[in-house]
Curated annotation (Swiss-Prot):
Residues 1-44 form the signal peptide. Residues 597-808 form the MRH domain. This is Endosome/lysosome-associated apoptosis and autophagy regulator family member 2. Belongs to the ELAPOR family. One of its GO terms (molecular function) is BMP receptor binding. It comes from Bos taurus. Residues 1-26 are annotated as: Disordered. SMART domains: Ephrin_rec_like. Keywords: Cell membrane, Disulfide bond, Glycoprotein, Membrane, Phosphoprotein, Signal, Transmembrane, Transmembrane helix. Residues 882-960 are cytoplasmic.
Length: 960
């Protein structure tokens, strides 16, 4: 049996793939030549055996044109090929045409033509069909076209094998949605792959919508060796504005090209991401197309040689391969553009009309007018259908908005420069010494302001093009009806720039203004309201979104940059790709929009506060640069590893907030950042900011990715040693207790940007702690109880430890040490107390040198004094001893004299000195001993036994 490769690539419509293109003629010894000659031999044998009986005894019938088809062989090295006839399956016949030389391999027909294989000439496509010539197109996505494949992977190589993860990626894929195909919404990496073989250089073109930077979207091309082509250097696809389609085109080389549309979602919270949408994929450069393709339902082609099918207008429809569109019965049926059938008109309800207010007339009156939503699809003549309310009721016009006045006409005009008005009175000049606070404040919605516009957009169709997405309603503006449930109802506010007050001129990094709006959403099904900002017409970024029914509330967004802003509100009833036209949900409403610059006195107060704080934290001057902290890692539900990265700038520098966080989601934005573009919108600057970092190994990218940058602190509240300031409290057990007695210094900040979770904005507290063990910038940490830096998502806490946070040194922080006296001189040194809990301040005094006396001199003096004292004591002892001897002698003599006169008559006692007595001796008797007496007694006590008692002879007569 003889097998040949499939035929050449065919252009297609409605998303059907073309066959792979073929090469041409091979050398005579090649397999292609062998196959051709073998086929010719078989055909000759079949022709010669035409009269022979078949296996059933009957000859084979001759082959008709319907019994076979033509195909080309593979191309040889010279670019030639053969056209051969291939019998259709289950057909037995004889007499196939002989092989003939085919067209060159690079041959192709023009758009609107196809290659008629019998004569090998290009022919125009008939009515109801179309052809791209050498291209293929995929514009119908009711199902995944043949040739396309989905490959879902989880590229995190750190967490572990896929079977250990909580959820796999088996259910993640690109989903066909009719007119477009939609990417995955989870954090899996899903590739939409299509392989094509080109005979000549060509290109690939597709339209896409990519509005959410929480999804990475890349398009690249590989060859048959799985090597990326040079043309995929810039594989990251640019973001588009919300509700708008962008286009992407890449040149293709001849040969095999494998096309990849790859998306990776980054889910760090509960908020769902918006998927990437792709439609109208066109590939140019295939060899030829051998047939024209019928127009898809809802389109038609009324001319031969068409390369595109036209869309059927409203209230018409068409089937596949239509030459024209068929009109619906407009009395009872309707259809949208590009419909394949007509639908019955439903009865009219209150959701099928809206009211508007006419401009004020000269009498100050406005009329309430009721109109059907266009195009009108309902019927008034059915049972239970309502009628359109009567129009023309007059009411008093609301006053002008603040800053505008009524000059007697039917419209409001802005106040001249230097004047102001609350909207109800004439414009007045500002008092002396004051300036007008410029801004817009829309409180009354009688007519749409001149700098606002409204529109309707649908990603899959044009049903609501030309409709008003929002309608004014007196004291508020509300979303319109739209044409489908998944329409985007868009309201734009354009601001060419900001003019800060004179008192703020020259301030850098300051709050230039803010926009505040009050809104509520009333939804009976799934709905979402987006608030988006575009700076200098670069790209629209979603700032905040609210899903489902929300009560009346206010939201504020702060502006720090003087640039051209476009603020956008987009309301969508459902974020799924559906084409429901009969359901019309309740609207969302906005009551007021305030767009005002910051008041001058607030900015002046802030400058004074920073001035006083600067005097108190002089010791922190070396911490004026940005401190950084990366904590984690954390993991998503499917195991994606990520980190929280914080930048902290305590006081900024010359009014600039140095803490900057960026989103380098694509190579394109990285190039913008490197180029220093002032319009780089993926960059935020503040006192404290946060980014989500995804390491390179986590998703298979060549570099770490930074996304979801948010401002945590843009307003400095104050600095104090207290733990509470303006309702921001730092609990005592949040951080470890400081080992020193030095109090911690606390910096308090606030962010004016509010979110659905933080209605009062975010706040930040930074605890500065003196730690001599951490020099330089030190280290930043978060509470152990709140590893993400916050426990509620609204208040963030940081502990910054550094020696630079220590107080200034004083004379109480050092002590002196005296050295030894050497050669009459002595040194005094000064050293810091340990541990040293201070920095800078006063310096250590220089060492002091003073005169002194040595120890030898005083030793000699002491010895001399001691010797003198000893001699003196010996002399005194001898003196008192001699004195004591004399006293004892006199006492003994007195006693002897007294005893010798006992026998004599008593004589008169006399104290007088007798003649011949010596007056030099005097004896005094005292009952109380003196100190010397006591010493003498002690000295003579042992000598009492040395004296003998002698009986003296009495001089008295015994007879007396």
């Amino acid at each position: 049996m003889l097998f040949l490769r499939p035929g050449p690539a065919r252009g297609r419509g409605r998303g059907r793939p073309a066959r792979a293109p073929h090469s041409g003629l091979s050398p005579p010894w090649s397999p292609a030549w062998i196959c051709c000659w073998a086929l010719a031999g078989c055909q000759a044998a079949w022709a010669g055996a035409g009269d022979l009986p078949s296996t059933s005894g009957r000859p084979l019938p001759p082959c008709l044109e319907k019994d076979y088809h033509f195909e080309y062989t593979e191309c040889d090295s010279s670019g030639s090929r053969w056209r051969v006839a291939i019998p259709n399956s289950a057909v037995d016949c004889s007499g196939l045409p002989d092989p003939v030389r085919g067209k060159e391999c690079t041959f192709s027909c023009a758009s609107g033509e196809y290659l008629e294989m019998k004569n090998q000439v290009c022919s125009k496509c008939g009515e109801g069909t179309y052809s791209l010539g050498s291209g293929i197109k995929f514009d119908e996505w009711d199902e995944l076209p043949a040739g396309f494949s989905n490959v879902a992977t989880f590229m995190d190589t750190v967490v572990g094998p896929s079977d250990s993860r909580p959820e796999g990626c088996n259910n993640s894929s690109w989903v066909p949605r009719g007119n477009y195909i939609e990417s995955n919404r989870d954090d899996c990496t899903v590739s939409l792959i299509y392989a094509v073989h080109l005979k000549k250089s060509g290109y690939v073109f597709f339209e896409y919508q990519y509005v959410d930077n929480n999804i990475f979207f890349e398009f690249f091309i590989q060859n048959d060796q799985c090597q990326e082509m040079d043309t995929t250097a810039d594989k990251w696809v640019k973001l588009t504005d919300n509700g708008e389609w962008g286009s992407h085109s890449v040149m293709l080389k001849s040969g095999t090209n494998i096309l990849y549309w790859r998306t990776t979602g980054i889910l760090m919270g509960s908020k769902a991401v918006k998927p990437v949408l792709v439609k109208n994929i066109t590939i140019e450069g295939v060899a030829y197309t051998s047939e024209c393709f019928p127009c898809k339902p809802g389109t038609f082609s009324d001319k031969p040689g068409s390369f595109i099918c036209q869309v059927c207008p409203r209230n018409t429809y068409s089937e596949k391969g239509a030459k024209e569109c068929i009109r619906c019965d407009e009395d009872s049926q309707f259809s949208e553009e590009g419909s394949s059938e007509c639908m019955e008109r439903p009865p009219c309800t209150s959701k099928d009309y809206f009211q508007i207010h006419t401009p004020c007339d000269e009498e100050g009156k406005t009329q309430i007018m009721y109109k059907w939503i266009e195009p009108k699809i309902c019927r008034e003549d059915l049972t239970d259908a309502i009628r359109l309310p009567p129009s023309g009721e007059k009411k008093d016009c609301p006053p002008c908005n603040p800053g505008f006045y009524n000059n007697g006409s039917s419209s409001c005009h802005p106040c001249p420069p230097g004047t102001f008005s609350d909207g109800t009175k004439e414009c007045r000049s500002c008092p002396a010494g004051t300036e007008p606070a410029l801004g817009f404040e829309y409180k009354w919605w009688n007519v749409l302001p001149g700098n606002m516009k409204t529109s309707c957009f649908n990603v899959g169709n044009s049903k609501c093009d030309g409709m008003n997405g929002w309608e004014v309603a007196g004291d508020h503006i509300q979303s319109g009806a739209g044409g489908s449930d998944n329409d985007y109802l868009i309201l734009n506010l354009h601001i060419p720039g900001f003019k800060p007050p004179t008192s703020m001129t020259g301030a850098m990094g300051s709050e230039l203004g803010r926009i505040t709006f009050v809104f509520e959403t009333l939804c009976s099904a799934d709905c979402v309201l987006y608030f988006m900002v575009d700076i200098n017409r670069k790209s629209t970024n979603v700032v905040e979104s609210w899903g489902g029914t929300k009560e009346k509330q206010a939201y504020t967004h702060v502006i720090f940059k003087n640039a051209t802003f476009t603020f956008t509100w987009a309301f969508q009833r459902t974020n799924q790709g559906q084409d429901a036209t009969t359901l019309r949900k309740k609207p969302t409403s906005a009551w007021s929009v305030h767009l005002i610059p910051t008041c001058p006195y607030i900015r002046s107060m802030a400058r004074r506060l920073v001035f006083h704080v600067g005097l108190g934290v002089e010791a922190l001057s070396n911490l004026s640069s940005v401190g950084s902290l990366m904590n984690g890692p954390s993991f998503t539900s499917k195991g994606t590893k990520y980190f929280h990265f914080f930048n902290i700038s305590l006081c900024g520098h010359e009014g600039k907030k140095l803490a900057v966080c960026t989103n380098n989601i694509t190579d394109f934005t990285v190039k913008e950042m490197v180029a220093g573009s002032d319009d780089y919108t993926n960059l935020v600057g503040a006192f404290v900011c946060q980014s989500t970092i995804i390491p390179s190994e986590s998703k298979g990218f060549r570099a770490a990715l930074s996304s979801q940058s948010i401002i945590l602190a843009d307003t400095f509240l104050g600095v104090t040693v207290e733990t509470t300031l303006q309702n921001i409290n730092i609990k005592e057990d949040m951080f470890p207790v400081s080992p020193s007695q030095i109090p911690d210094v606390h910096f308090f900040y606030k962010s004016s940007t509010t979110t659905t979770s933080c209605v009062n904005g975010r706040s930040t507290a930074v605890k500065m702690r003196c730690n001599p063990a951490k020099p330089g910038a030190g280290a930043i940490s978060v509470p152990s109880k709140c590893p993400a830096g916050t426990c509620d998502g609204c208040t963030f806490y940081f502990l910054w430890e550094s020696v630079e946070a220590c107080p200034l040194c004083t004379e109480h922080d050092f002590h002196e040490i005296e050295g030894a006296c050497k050669r009459g001189f002595q040194e005094t040194l000064y050293v810091w107390n340990e541990p040293k809990w201070c920095i800078k301040g006063i310096s250590l005094p220089e060492k002091k040198l003073s005169t002194c006396e040595t120890v030898d001199f005083w030793l000699k003096v002491g010895a001399g004094v001691g010797a003198f004292t000893a001699v003196l004591l010996v002399a005194l002892t001898c003196y008192f001893w001699k004195k004591n001897q004399k006293l004892e002698y006199k006492y003994s003599k007195l006693v002897m004299t007294t005893n010798s006169k006992e026998c004599e008559l008593p004589a008169a006692d006399s104290c007088a000195i007798m003649e011949g007595e010596d007056n030099e001796e005097e004896v005094v008797y005292s009952n109380k001993q003196s100190l010397l007496g006591k010493l003498k007694s002690l000295a003579t006590k042992e000598k009492e036994d040395h004296f003998e008692s002698v009986q003296l002879k009495s001089s008295r007569s015994p007879n007396i």
